[in-house]
Amino acid sequence: MTPVRLGVLAGIVALVLDQVTKLWLLYGFELARKGVVQVLPFFDLVLAWNTGISYGWFSGQGPTGQILMLAFKAVAIVALAIWMARSTTKLATIGLGLIIGGAIGNAIDRLAYGAVVDFALLHAEIGGKIYNWYVFNIADVAIVVGVAALLYDSLIGLPAAKAP
């Protein structure tokens, strides 16, 4: 399988997993009605509607802000797709595919609901104090793993084979 096809496949898998989990948690599991659901001592399911970007930055910007964020995301997705089409390593194309799939998943939420559906909360109690990570979703995980793959590929990965 060519590197680009691997990237496209990674993006499709990330997008499908993201949307299926969100739809199931919203409409099958009814997370909104259940509130906080403890899965493990350090992991809860909790519904959060993120109208901003990472960590809720730029939330509350209204319809104009939502349109601007979607437009920026569309441009970024096109740029990442061009980069993926030109990439020569499998790891880079997989990483770019994961980022694209995650970005599209969150963009679908923004179009459908006016906010991104976040649901996973990691936390730890240390010395009697509770520390929470931000609430995230599968698309966010795909984006982070994709960025990590790109960093690894560019800093440590094997050089791409040269064409004859």
Curated annotation (Swiss-Prot):
Pathway: Protein modification; lipoprotein biosynthesis (signal peptide cleavage). It is a multi-pass membrane protein. PROSITE patterns: SPASE_II (PS00855). It is an enzyme of class 3 (hydrolase). It is found in: Cell inner membrane. One of its GO terms (molecular function) is aspartic-type endopeptidase activity. It catalyses: Release of signal peptides from bacterial membrane prolipoproteins. Hydrolyzes -Xaa-Yaa-Zaa-|-(S,diacylglyceryl)Cys-, in which Xaa is hydrophobic (preferably Leu), and Yaa (Ala or Ser) and Zaa (Gly or Ala) have small, neutral side chains. Its main location: membrane. The chain crosses the membrane at residues 6-26, 39-59, 65-85, 88-108, 141-161. GO terms for cellular component: plasma membrane. The active site is at D118, D140. The keyword Membrane applies. The keyword Transmembrane helix applies. GO terms for biological process: proteolysis. Belongs to the peptidase A8 family. This protein specifically catalyzes the removal of signal peptides from prolipoproteins. This is Lipoprotein signal peptidase. It comes from Rhodopseudomonas palustris (strain ATCC BAA-98 / CGA009).
